[in-house]
Every structure is written in C-alpha cells, then in structure tokens.
Amino acid sequence: MEESHFNSNPYFWPSIPTVSGQIENTMFINKMKDQLLPEKGCGLAPPHYPTLLTVPASVSLPSGISMDTESKSDQLTPHSQASVTQNITVVPVPSTGLMTAGVSCSQRWRREGSQSRGPGLVITSPSGSLVTTASSAQTFPISAPMIVSALPPGSQALQVVPDLSKKVASTLTEEGGGGGGGGGSVAPKPPRGRKKKRMLESGLPEMNDPYVLSPEDDDDHQKDGKTYRCRMCSLTFYSKSEMQIHSKSHTETKPHKCPHCSKTFANSSYLAQHIRIHSGAKPYSCNFCEKSFRQLSHLQQHTRIHSKMHTETIKPHKCPHCSKTFANTSYLAQHLRIHSGAKPYNCSYCQKAFRQLSHLQQHTRIHTGDRPYKCAHPGCEKAFTQLSNLQSHRRQHNKDKPFKCHNCHRAYTDAASLEVHLSTHTVKHAKVYTCTICSRAYTSETYLMKHMRKHNPPDLQQQVQAAAAAAAVAQAQAQAQAQAQAQAQAQAQAQASQASQQQQQQQQQQQQQQQQPPPHFQSPGAAPQGGGGGDSNPNPPPQCSFDLTPYKTAEHHKDICLTVTTSTIQVEHLASS
C-alpha cells in the first residue's frame, strides 16, 4: 500500500489564515477570473461553494454596526470553528474588480446605536466613505457595493480601499476605545517619489489596492513606449535627447526670417534649407535614378532603396547600349532615342526637331510668347516659359546659391552657370567676349549679356549683337594670327635646314680640297689643268720625276717630294762652292 502524500503530522499543517490573508486571496482569484474569461462584461457564474470571509469571535464590529444572524449558515471553511466564527458572504463585482460585502443569511445590514466593542471590521462604500457613524439608523441593501477591510483587535489605524477613480490610496485613522463611535479623517496626499513601505501600529504591513495604478506605473508605461512628446507643439520623438534639442527651438531667439512666409529660424543654415522649398532648388541628385532632393539627408535616405534586388524587380527594362534600367517600356523608348538620334517631334515654326513632346511644348512657347510661369516676388513682374527658369530666377531674390564650384568655391543659382564657370578653369577657353562699353572680357555670351544689363543702354539687343560680332571678328583675327605665326615658324625651319645643308656642303668641299695634292706636283704624263688651249700657264710648275705608283696617298708623295727637293738644293750648293 502506497503511503499517503498527506502529511498526518499536525506540526506541518498550515496555520489558520487571517482575515487580511483571505481578502488578498479572494482578490487574487477574482483577478485571475477576469483575465481568463473571454468577455469581462458578462456576469460571473455562482461558485459551487460561496466565498466566505471568516471573522473571529474576538473581532468585534465597529460602533454602530451589527449583524442580524437570524439564520446562521452551516457552511464553514476548513479551518473555521462554528462556535467562535461569524460568516459574511463576499460577492465579487466584475465591473470594478472589488468586492461587496453582505450578511450571508440576513437580507440587510442594520445600523444600531449600540456601544462599540473595538475596531475589528470596517465597511466602506466605493467612494471611500467610512460607514461607522451612529448619527441615525440607516439600512443598506445587500446589493449595495460595500468594501470590507479588517484588522486584528487593538489596532487603531484602519486601511480603506478607495474608488478606482483615485490613483493614490487614502488612509483613514480612527481613535479607538471611546464610546459613541470613532470618526475618520482623510490624510493628505503623500509626496511624490518612491514610496516607502509603511508599517501599521499593529506591526502588519500596510495593504494597497493591487488594481489601482500609481504614478510610477504611468511613468514606466511611457518608458516602455519609447516616445517623448514636445509640450509646445505635440511632436513625438523616439529619444529624449532629440526631444530636448527640439524643445530649444521654442525658447531660443530666431532672428533669421523667411522673406516669403512668416517662419523664423535660429541660424542661417536652417533658413537656407527652408528657402529651397520656395525656390524649388534641389542640388542633391541621385546617381541611380537622377532624382533631386533639397537636403542631403533626404538623398541619403533615398539611396537606401537602391539595392540590387530593388533595381532588378522595380526596373526590369534595361538599355541594350548602356547600363541604365527603367521601370516601363515608355521610359526605355525615350532613352533609346538618345542612342539612335531620333527626333520625331518637329516644330511647325522653325522646323526644329526634339526627342520628347514636352521639349517641343517648351520650345513653342518661344514663338507664341506664352509665359505661364510668373514670379510671385513683390515688385517683380517677370514671367518665364519654363519652370526651371522661374526656379533659377527665384534664387536671385532669395540669394540662394546651391551650385558650388569645387575649385574656387564660387556659388551659382543654376547648374548651367556652374558649367560655364567650370570651363574657365581649363586653358582652352579664353575670354573672347568683350564689352564694347567698358572693354571687360568674358568667357561666354551669357555672362556678357548679364554684364550688359548693368550698363542699361537704350538698345540692349543691338549692343549685345554688336559685341558678339566684335567677339567673332576678334576670334577670326586671332586664328589668322595663329596661322601666320605657324607659317613663319615653318619658313624659319626651312631656312635653317637649308643653311645647315649649305654648311655641310662647304665642309665636304673643304675636305676634298685638303685631300687633293699640291698643283705643282703632278704625276708624269698628267695633262695640265685648263685643257690644251692657248690659255695655258706660261710658267708651269715643275713636274715630279718620281713614279707615284707605289704610293697610295698624296701625303706620302708630298713627303717624298720635299725630301728630294731639299737634297737637290744641297747638292747644287756644294757644286757652286
């Protein structure tokens, strides 16, 4: 036979639960029931055994409170004793999560002006009022919501469970011992901050309502959400630091005001970013889809979507000539006209052709004079045929120059002006467009036209045309001078080459003359120079009597001749002596 799991030793039996412990257990059970039920609004099914609150006989009711026990209930708790207990049914209320108290057998509570036998049981209404006054006889039906709180005898402080509309529990204190019933007074609200666990005079800890939320719970709930709201404009942020930085914008001075609207800003950089909304400037372009943005942060956020998967799925149409992709076939067809050079849209006024219909529509406004884009700046009545021209014009009013040169850090209002400026950094482009009034030179006709507006002549167009013609003539003259210089250099090179050739010929002739023998030494049988005519030399030089056959060079022959001549002179001198 197996041993029973029940420990028969009375030493290990649990102690008899107190009144406060039964209240906490009952409230915990009711809370679990509310959470497990699918519909909290429906009524609770009656339990198999009614929930009983055991009040010991030693605990007496407050002054003026008594129970009508005409018929006592026979249902007791396992640890209760019929001779020393009185039972009160505690009925849970689903709508509030609290409990109503009533007599288990009688139909109502009766208020009597009897003497108080000690503070052991306290009954309050949901609003927090203490039902202990014996001023008049009052009856409370069993359906009335009553809240029960009990303490051991001898304690003077009584805990009262407040209504759910209050977040901070209030404490009622009653001065015990005297006759006529004790009166209760509401204590002031405790200070904010972390609450310490207080102990009652009886030595038991103070009981709080587990269903009432405290201010600390609300703060924790806000921290879990990770959102911070600005008190001035109700904007929400995900970090406290961002909210603090934003809140400074409501308190700091804002001297920079927008000329188009009433907004003001704390510094000039914020104002410059805001002005781009009015001017339409978008200097930051995407390298993938050529979209433009006003701020660098917007461009960085946009480039995140350009992954490999995004390009393959969103832009499946790829150009066969380059690496560009497009979302649909119409965009691809427009792009292919760049490679093929096709321009199907022709102008009916000047027979110009364009690749896109929108370009033709913009061009026809030049002939018709239609200028739908007008400047809204006060005092400015200019109108433009294209939106881009209007946006560039607005930047002149706003003094916004987002297009900057990387070489000299100069800024411009549009990309075309920046491209013209970048050409000045190259050596090929020279300043050929000169003003006829002040003789200033510029690298492009656009800059010259802008400069001519400053002089404000009577006929600006004629002046510009004259300046352009003068620039063309100057350019032609410069080209002619360059050609003349090139021809002169070629002639100089030819003359130098001829002179060098003549010098080489002279050197060769001199070498040949040095190699020939002296004219007065000739080999026997050699004909005299000058031919056999009558112009022969009357005093011919003496001929050499030596045979030159064994001598290969004239130098050797010359040495021999000199030696023979010297020896002959010596012989003649000896003979004469």
Curated annotation (Swiss-Prot):
The modification Phosphoserine is found at residue 214. InterPro entries: Znf_C2H2-type, Znf_C2H2_sf, Znf_C2H2_type. It holds the Pfam family zf-C2H2_6. One of its GO terms (molecular function) is sequence-specific double-stranded DNA binding. A zinc finger (C2H2-type) spans 228-250, 256-278, 284-306, 317-339, 345-367, 373-397, 403-425, 433-455. Residues 171-225, 501-550 are annotated as: Disordered. SMART domains: ZnF_C2H2. Keywords: DNA-binding, Metal-binding, Nucleus, Phosphoprotein, Repeat, Transcription, Transcription regulation, Zinc, Zinc-finger. GO terms for biological process: regulation of transcription by RNA polymerase II. It is found in: Nucleus. The keyword Zinc-finger applies. GO terms for cellular component: nucleus. Residues 175-185 have a biased composition (Gly residues). Residues 501-515 have a biased composition (Low complexity). Its main location: nucleus. SUPFAM superfamilies: beta-beta-alpha zinc fingers. Interacts with BCAR1. Transcription factor that binds the consensus DNA sequence [GC]AAAAA. Seems to bind and regulate the promoters of MMP1, MMP3, MMP7 and COL1A1. Belongs to the krueppel C2H2-type zinc-finger protein family. This is Zinc finger protein 384.
